Amino acid sequence: MKTSQQVYEAAKSLLENTEIIDLLNNLGTVHIVGSYAANLMWDPDIDIVVITDTPQESAIKAINDLARKEKFQKFQFGDFKNHPKKNRPESFIINARKEWKGEKWEIETWFVTELGDKLEIVEKLKNLNNKDKETIIEKKKQRSLSGDTKHDLSSWEIYQDFI
């Protein structure tokens, strides 16, 4: 059975292999957020936020540049500025997918004009005691084993009891 640390190490090597952070740094201020940043990983996904004055243009450039690098198998583009969705920031998003170390990985990159309180939340999660961190990872594990997805029960919903 995999461990949270193994998922984290796979994520770290995926970020290095794809060089996605280097590419995104050319488009704005990059922050890795969510479970990777807090080292609370279970599922094979990474959340990144790019702060930029031009979210739409930056997202379009990113998807074109990433496609040319040929490091990912599949991309999705989302427009939550002109097509708002509940619980989603006014933003543009790229989902980049790749098989890596036997898992189907997804890197979600959000292009926004401001970050909000995401970094404060990550800091709170990093500072949790080990028991709470283990409980969060166990809840993520149970979500995965039950067949639920992060869209059925998001990690942010899991975190609410701890922050």
Regions found by a protein language model. Name each.
Residues 53-58, 101-103, 114-116:
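Short, charged/polar surface micro-motifs in flexible loops or helix N-caps
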Residues 71-109:
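Conserved catalytic core of two-metal-ion nucleotidyltransferases
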Residues 20-63:
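Active-site nucleotide-donor binding segment shared across nucleotidyl transfer reactions
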Residues 106-163:
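Catalytic cores of NTP-dependent nucleotidyl/adenyl transfer enzymes across multiple folds
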Residues 1-33:
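Helical scaffold of the NTase/Pol beta-like nucleotidyltransferase catalytic core
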Residues 6, 10, 19-23, 58, ...:
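Exposed alpha-helical structural elements
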Residues 54-81:
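A broadly used, surface-exposed interaction patch
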